[in-house]
Amino acid sequence: MKSVLITGVSRGIGLSIAKEFIQNDYFVFGTSRSKFDLSKALESNNCKHLIVDVNDRDSIASIMKDIPGENNTLDCLVNNAGITADQLFIRMKDSEWDDVINTNLTGIFNITKPVSKMMLKQKSGSIINISSVSGLMGNAGQVNYSSSKSALLGFTKSLAKELAPRGINVNCICPGFIESDMTNELTSDQRDQALSQIPLG
């Protein structure tokens, strides 16, 4: 059975991705920052929940021994964990900038590094980074979020060139406006702005 590690698995896009992998007969390792009944959410025992904060390198190191699947390999990493802290730039607190950049960009560095070492040893694997259309187009009130997601595109392109010769794929997906717990936190103006970018509304 193939295995996948998905960060930010407790809700929204991450949980939907996990369900898709379960349907395709993968064993799912899913992370979140707090306790979560992943088996119940996925209606499957082919999964394991790991409590980890992608900002905490010691926390990541402590779970790596639990990651390899039944063949002592990890076939795929999905970097999905992310946060928003929307605010007009002139009013944005340092902490709102730091928290978003640390989770959405540095957090991906933190977990991808040990996973890529594992994949280099096995000479195979796939890394999928979840960016956002906000990283392509920008959004008012999301300078921090858009910056983190735009930077992730560069991260992906560069890492892909480094790892491709060793048989490891690195790709990035930029979802548009998707109904989720994160988008439910947007103001009506932000929702209207996002919807205005969709030709069919």
Cite the ranges covered by each PLM segment.
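Conserved glycine-rich cofactor-binding loop
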Residues: 10-11
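Substrate-binding pocket helix/loop in short-chain dehydrogenase/reductase
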Residues: 88-89, 93-101, 183, 191-194
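Active-site loop immediately N-terminal to the catalytic Tyr-X3-Lys motif
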Residues: 90, 137-143, 165-166, 201
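Active-site helix of classical SDR
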Residues: 112, 148, 156
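Alpha-helical segment proximal to the catalytic Tyr-Lys
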Residues: 117, 161-165
